[in-house]
Structures are given as structure tokens and as C-alpha cells.
């Protein structure tokens, strides 16, 4: 990687420019960080980390990258950036032990390198969003908006993966520490430059002394696409998380080998009425279970599968427990009597 860093010692915004050695196009960030905090009146404030915003920023260089110490005497905040270069990977790390608060203000969030790799309206490329099966956001005709999607939450962000392709340049971003307190900030057609960008923001009040770390894997020109960015994350999991591919795991597990070939069939047996008419349910007032399938009917389905020549199938029985689906949790036994009970 070829990196140019200017922390804005003259009063201008700091910026970072990164270029893969096999690519003529660089990806840039025009700010070191954005932060939010609660002031002494418990009101949320926000600002950028820059010299012109009153921060003292001290940059040091070594053979592996840069260390940037940031402090603001008036706000009472200080923390340290580590930018580590490892071949074609830029590791951005904020050590948890170096995040300090010395005044009444309390840090709420830190967003390192906001708008890194941002593209403008109409440029060739797209953002990569790891929502459910995956999404691409092209740089055209989007509403001016900022979205914040927490990682591992109900919105479907199932992986700490993000990325961007801009012309012939691209990166795979992986949040490797602090991911459980992270969210992806997605900007579309924003501000006067009509920018598109994606990157992590870390919430601080509930974090468990974890470093805040994101790795940017820069792609060579012929691999600056969403397919190879996905492969990059796959290889990362193999190397660093000891994840074994299914085709290797089935060699030692007959059950898994069977499941890999079998049709999955979900059978819904019993449920309680939804939406709930009785919110606080007890043994005395809980509603009756609505029956969709009894255990006897389940056996009939098994027999029909066999008669139709379906040899491999895995059946998931939903709502077999006491009270059915959304039943008498945490109590699941005995088996629901109206479905046939223990005898069936």
C-alpha cells in the first residue's frame, strides 16, 4: 500500500489517501474521526476530530504505519489511533485502554475515518452492504440520506463486513474488534459533494474494554468487485476464525453429510393466538393452543414423502412444546397434549 497522511497540523482538516500498489486510483478520507458525546447537561453533542475544532493531534511514524494521539483539553477527551500497514491491509485501531474522559462530558460514539473511499453521484461503482443475502448500492439516483444499521441486530446485518468499489479501486472492510457495539453508517447522495460512503461507528457506553478495530483489505484492479470482496471475507474467516468449510466437515460427520443433501421441511404444529389478546399470561388465563398439525398427521406426511420417492429430508417440528409456538416458555415440557402428547 502507498499511504499519505496529513493530520491537519496547519488547521485544515486531516486526510488520508491510500492506494494499492497495483492500482492507479486512490481512496481517501477527509477527516480522522467524528464523535458524539453527552455534555454536562446530558445533551448529545457532535463534532469532528481536527485541529481547527480545538484538538491537539500528534502524529508519529514507524516502519509499520502511524500512531496518532488525539486530545481535547476543553472537552476532556483523549484517545489514540493506530494505523498499521500489513501488505495490502490497513488496520485502523483505537485501543480501549487509551480512551480517556477527564471532564463531565461522556463519549457516546467514535466514527473513525468517516467517508473513507467516498464516491460522488454518477461515479462507476457501488457500496457493499452485508444485509441478509447482501445488497449493492450504486452511486446514482438515491435520496440524500444517512442510514445507521447496527451489526448483529434485527435489521439483518449478519456480518461485520462492508465494502466499496469505486472505478478500478475497492476494499473489503471487516470490523475485527468491537463489532458487537458497532453500526454501519451509510451515506447516499449527501452534502454538497453528493457523496456515497459506508464505514463503522462504535458505541462506547456499553463496550467491554474491547479495542475498536477495522481492517481495510485493498483489492487489486482485477479483483475490485463484490464477488472478490466476498471471497476476501471468506478467506479471512478461514484464516483467523478457524472456520472449516462444509465440504470438509461432512467427511467426519455422517449426520452433516446427510443434512447437506436433504430437503428441509418446516412443519408448524401448534401456536397461541397472535397478536396477543392477553399480554400477561398465566396458567389460569392462557388461551387455548391453535392446532395446525397433530403428531398423527406428521406421521402421515412422513409416509407420503416416502411414497413419493423422497429419500432424504430433514423435518423441523415447530410448536411441539407445551403451549405450542410462543407457548409456555421457558417451560417446554411436557409435549403439548392437544397435539397427541407423549403417547403420540
Locate predicted features.
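Acidic/aromatic-lined carbohydrate-recognition and catalytic surfaces
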Residues: 319-344
Amino acid at each position: 500500500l502507498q499511504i499519505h497522511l496529513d493530520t491537519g497540523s496547519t488547521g485544515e482538516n486531516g486526510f488520508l489517501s491510500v492506494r494499492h500498489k497495483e492500482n492507479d486510483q486512490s481512496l481517501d478520507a477527509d477527516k480522522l474521526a467524528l464523535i458524539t458525546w453527552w455534555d454536562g447537561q446530558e445533551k448529545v453533542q457532535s463534532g469532528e476530530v481536527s485541529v481547527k475544532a480545538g484538538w491537539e493531534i500528534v502524529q508519529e511514524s514507524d516502519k509499520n504505519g502511524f500512531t496518532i494521539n488525539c486530545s481535547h483539553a476543553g472537552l476532556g477527551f483523549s484517545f489514540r489511533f493506530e494505523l498499521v500497514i500489513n501488505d495490502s491491509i490497513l488496520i485502523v485501531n483505537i485501543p480501549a485502554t487509551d480512551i480517556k474522559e477527564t471532564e463531565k462530558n461522556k463519549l457516546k460514539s467514535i466514527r473513525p475515518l468517516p467517508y473513507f473511499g467516498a464516491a460522488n453521484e454518477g461515479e462507476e461503482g457501488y457500496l457493499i452492504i452485508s444485509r441478509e443475502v447482501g445488497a449493492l448500492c450504486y452511486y446514482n439516483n438515491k435520496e440524500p440520506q444517512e442510514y445507521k444499521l447496527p451489526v448483529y441486530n434485527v435489521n439483518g446485518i449478519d456480518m461485520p463486513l462492508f465494502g466499496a468499489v469505486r472505478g478500478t479501486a475497492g476494499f473489503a472492510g471487516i470490523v475485527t474488534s468491537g463489532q458487537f457495539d458497532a453500526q454501519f453508517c451509510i451515506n447516499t447522495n449527501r452534502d454538497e459533494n453528493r457523496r456515497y460512503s459506508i464505514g463503522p461507528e462504535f458505541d462506547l457506553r456499553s463496550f467491554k474494554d474491547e479495542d475498536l478495530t477495522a481492517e481495510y483489505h485493498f483489492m487489486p484492479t482485477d479483483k475490485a468487485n463484490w464477488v472478490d470482496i466476498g471471497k476476501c471475507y471468506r478467506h479471512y474467516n478461514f484464516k483467523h476464525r478457524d472456520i472449516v468449510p462444509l465440504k470438509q466437515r461432512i467427511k467426519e460427520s455422517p449426520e452433516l453429510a446427510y443434512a447437506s443433501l436433504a430437503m428441509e421441511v418446516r412443519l408448524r404444529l401448534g401456536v397461541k393466538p397472535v397478536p396477543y389478546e392477553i399480554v400477561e399470561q398465566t396458567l389460569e388465563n392462557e388461551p387455548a393452543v391453535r392446532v395446525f398439525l397433530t403428531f398423527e398427521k406428521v406421521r402421515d406426511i412422513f409416509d407420503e414423502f416416502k411414497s413419493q420417492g423422497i429419500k432424504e429430508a430433514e423435518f423441523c417440528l415447530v410448536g411441539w412444546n407445551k403451549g405450542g409456538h410462543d407457548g409456555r416458555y421457558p417451560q417446554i415440557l411436557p409435549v403439548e397434549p392437544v397435539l397427541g402428547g407423549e403417547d403420540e
